[in-house]
Curated annotation (Swiss-Prot):
The keyword Isomerase applies. Pfam families: PseudoU_synth_1 (PF01416). The active site is at D60. Its EC number is 5.4.99.12. Residues 168-172 are annotated as: Interaction with tRNA. This is tRNA pseudouridine synthase A. It comes from Escherichia coli (strain 55989 / EAEC). GO terms for molecular function: RNA binding; tRNA pseudouridine(38-40) synthase activity. Substrate binds at Y118. GO terms for biological process: tRNA pseudouridine synthesis. Homodimer. It catalyses: uridine(38/39/40) in tRNA = pseudouridine(38/39/40) in tRNA. The record marks R58, R78, R110, R126, F139 as: Interaction with tRNA.
Amino acid sequence: MSDQQQPPVYKIALGIEYDGSKYYGWQRQNEVRSVQEKLEKALSQVANEPITVFCAGRTDAGVHGTGQVVHFETTAQRKDAAWTLGVNANLPGDIAVRWVKAVPDDFHARFSATARRYRYIIYNHRLRPAVLSKGVTHFYEPLDAERMHRAAQCLLGENDFTSFRAVQCQSRTPWRNVMHINVTRHGPYVVVDIKANAFVHHMVRNIVGSLMEVGAHNQPESWIAELLAAKDRTLAAATAKAEGLYLVAVDYPDRYDLPKPPMGPLFLAD
């Protein structure tokens, strides 16, 4: 008797949006809420088999995503609406699938990515916000966004980011390639937009923490360049809070033809 034929395996990519304020980060962990665990549970219900997802970037506790990308493999053959509307019906309100795309075998959400982009949102006002309290970081001292932008330009290109790297970072190298970093003001909001090939642990939040010191005129514009050259985390400012940080986009080679929805968050244009 011939062996039973194995069902075909499909590889699917999804775009995911989430409010990370009630989660202990992206990665599945025992006994605490994670975005990965909720997504895998919802996908498994739709697929009627256990699903494991792989993501482009494992965000920390309290960090949000508008442009997270994941992939998974399944023998379940479903219409696109099942992987979007169907999965969303099984997800909590603070996690949502934005798009679905069948991808070839060589695609990997993490290893195929060529760049990641983050936006950090500062609510720069004397009084704290209420409605967006978990979606922005409040900073009450007046910030000079143009000064912050000028100071940040020394971070462009390939550099050793030891001064902006968490002590517990497990990456083999502190070197990263920053493609752009822009600081702009939108009314009471100051936005730090940074894109790099990859990021060391807490890199964006550590950079923002130091840029806020420059923006508040507590440090000179030259301080960021001095920190970069010093390669000493203890000299830089405290890590900025998680609430204001969003993973907004992940770049992949054009041949995968993945959707590119608006990055956001909220009012921010691409």
